[in-house]
A protein has these predicted regions:
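Substrate-binding/charge-relay-adjacent region of secreted/lumenal peptidase catalytic domains
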Residues: 1-195
Length: 195
């Protein structure tokens, strides 16, 4: 499987950047140690990871990505697969692609910017031939408020519960295509903001 090849042998850098304890910097070495990532360099050039952004607000800067890669002793590798519109750089999207680059060095990093929300992204994704191996979504919203203002009305005036069920079915289809879908637990942790 493509995912088994994702993290082949990790080779520690011969000249890691030296920073002092307590100086506030968190470099790649800290993340790898903190999360016990022992194989972070992708050897298979076909492996791809993708930051998914919504509501047409995601944007990245390849220059910022290259700076991050250089400061962390990584090989510079631009994002060439951008689906949708790359708006001006946004902090969340920048963080997403930079973290992917750090924990999966040398992977083909994508950015996918959808104009709407979960369901429309899923339909667009499932109707696309050339897709990434791994999706990472760091967006979230209360389950009971999926059809509330700010997100737009749900298709066919569904309730939030119906919408979630439909979205879940579409994401199962992504898994059946062999795509790994990783979703953050949110800024407030797994229980969310509204429990």
């Amino acid at each position: 499987s493509a995912h088994a090849d994702m993290f082949a042998a990790y080779t520690p850098r011969s000249n890691p950047k030296s920073v002092g304890a307590g100086d506030g910097y968190v470099g790649r070495e800290v993340l790898l140690k903190l999360y016990n990532i022992t194989h972070s360099r992708v050897e298979n050039p076909e492996i791809s990871v993708c930051a998914v952004e919504y509501q047409n607000v995601g944007g990245i800067s390849n220059q910022d990505l290259e700076t991050q890669q250089s400061l962390n002793g990584e090989v510079k590798k631009d994002i060439v697969h951008i689906k949708g519109t790359n708006q001006s750089p946004m902090l969340e999207a920048q963080l997403d692609v930079q973290m992917m680059s750090q924990v999966a060095e040398n992977a083909d990093v994508w950015m996918w910017s959808g104009t709407q929300w979960l369901y429309s992204f899923a339909v667009d994704f499932l109707n696309t031939t050339d897709i990434p191996d791994v999706l990472s979504m760091s967006w979230g919203w209360s389950a009971r408020d999926q059809c509330s203002s700010g997100l737009g009305t749900c298709p066919g005036n569904m309730t939030s519960s119906q919408y979630l069920h439909r979205v879940n079915m579409e994401y199962v289809k992504m898994g059946l295509r062999g795509v790994t879908v990783a979703v953050s637990s949110g800024d407030a942790g797994a229980p969310g903001r509204t429990n």
